[in-house]
């Protein structure tokens, strides 16, 4: 089985390559061939990167379809994970990777006649809900038209529509979509700090806030999952050639008190959503930090997902709780952890 992982050096991509290497080792199945595609090569001396054959392709480039087609030839599945969260002040640059890049991957899958494509969607693709709406978990049939004030959500929703069209035009290709909650792991600490807090904020900040309370709006209720558990879901989707959409999230649902505990803080105090959104907007416009207010809208507006289908069809279960996944990330902040073979890109 030849599996190509596009975007194989990021938070999730590294975990997927690691899981595929483990599947080959645990099962003694040396026929599993892992091919990594990234914008730049990782350090092949670091695990798990040495377990894959590598190609460098910019998925948003004008020649991406031709280059990806050549890489995809003879593959049994393509797992598409490439994504750009930065620069948040330049949406066309993000669009080039996120939406144009996905269109290029799908076109190359069709041209190379790959039998399955697995695409990283997200809880962020779903239509938003209010506070009361978070009381009822939704399944994979919930509309995927996104949250209109969040660039990330807009791009994920656009890709869902692109996959709908691709699926209709190419019925012989198995199209699989994973829609995970927020994805955490220890080694992603430097990447996540750079993407959401900025490099002006030291990673050791978690050591300074333990005697503080966490100010958050009440609607900040969302799900998370460990990167290794998401990677396991990707492997199971490929191994079983499972079609359709799958919600991926661990228990329990995270809320302000649980978030405060994970950060080792004294507790949480409720503040108005409008206040936090305003602070984030001003500091983002002043370029003091890289997170735009759309991420506040995502945290406050995404629905809570049911994961029954992943359990029944994929046989998937989270091995880590959402709190364990977040605590691992927090520990990574304190230790300055980073993916060893692929440093975080700066926006």
What are these regions (language model features)?
Residues 1-29:
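N-terminal Rossmann NAD(P)H-binding glycine-rich loop of SDR-like oxidoreductase domains
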Residues 147-176:
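Active-site Tyr-X1-5-Lys
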Residues 167-221:
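NAD(P)-dependent short-chain dehydrogenase/reductase
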Residues 227, 256-257, 284-317:
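Conserved C-terminal active-site "lid" loop/helix of NAD(P)H-dependent oxidoreductases
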